[in-house]
Amino acid sequence: SKSDWEEALKDQDAIVHYAAETGTGQSMYEVEKYVDVNINGTALMLNLLVNGSYNVKKVIVASSRSIYGEGKYISKELGAVYPTQRESIHMDQGDFEVKYPNSSALTLVGTDEESKIHPSSVYGITKQNQEQMVLTVCPTVGIAGVAFRYQNVYGPGQSLKNPYTGILSIFSTQIKNGNNINIFEDGLESRDFVYVDDVVEATILGIEKDEANYEVFNVGLGEAIDVNTVA
């Protein structure tokens, strides 16, 4: 709410904006909620910074890997490509590979900050909007904006009840309850998992270092780990 933001912004030099609804799947059937909390909530913060009197000098916004959609791949025929969502007709046949028109098999490569942005969920769209608003509005009032595109964060304090916090929390809950771990598809889909302490360290550096101002950073381990390995 406006009053919450007004209280949060008082006497602060820097704001680390984590307030958001999370969950790519959930966002597809709770569209209004995600847009209202993530986009409108960020707009409310920025509106206060623009029109109020605060001491804030820097805003760090928590973005997400989800803004890249399926990510970056290399095609022998076409070079770097950015596939859209996989089609159910292929997945129903047990074919879980990402495809691209007029291309043979694709090779997954690291998705850097210069890669194409094309979110495949409402959640991803809202995170893209959040970072663009912060990086666009903040400089107009002398505030440095920084966007961190966090990968799959895990560690102490992570909810084991919320199914939208990622597979590590889901697997942990299954193990804790003495259940078998269910792996969907072929288990070869991969993610970059980053420990929460590393995320905290990166975020602190973003606050302290002027070199981070007005920049976008991926925050991850830099290593693809497939689901079978995690399990």
What label would you give each PLM region?
Residues 129, 133, 137, 167, ...:
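Hydrophobic alpha-helix immediately C-terminal to the catalytic Tyr-X-X-X-Lys motif of short-chain
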Residues 70-75, 158-162, 230-231:
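Short aromatic-enriched loop/helix-cap "lid" or pocket-rim segments at secondary-structure transitions
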Residues 128, 141-143, 153-169, 177-179, ...:
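Glycine/proline-rich active-site loop of Rossmann-fold NAD(P)-dependent oxidoreductases
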Residues 1-151:
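N-terminal Rossmann-like NAD(P)+-binding domain of SDR-like oxidoreductases, especially those catalyzing
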Residues 7-8, 174, 202:
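CheY-like receiver
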Residues 29, 37-40, 114, 121, ...:
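Residue-level signal for the nucleotide or nucleotide-sugar donor/cofactor binding architecture
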Residues 30, 48, 52, 174, ...:
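Generic structural signal for alpha-helix termini and adjacent loop/cap motifs
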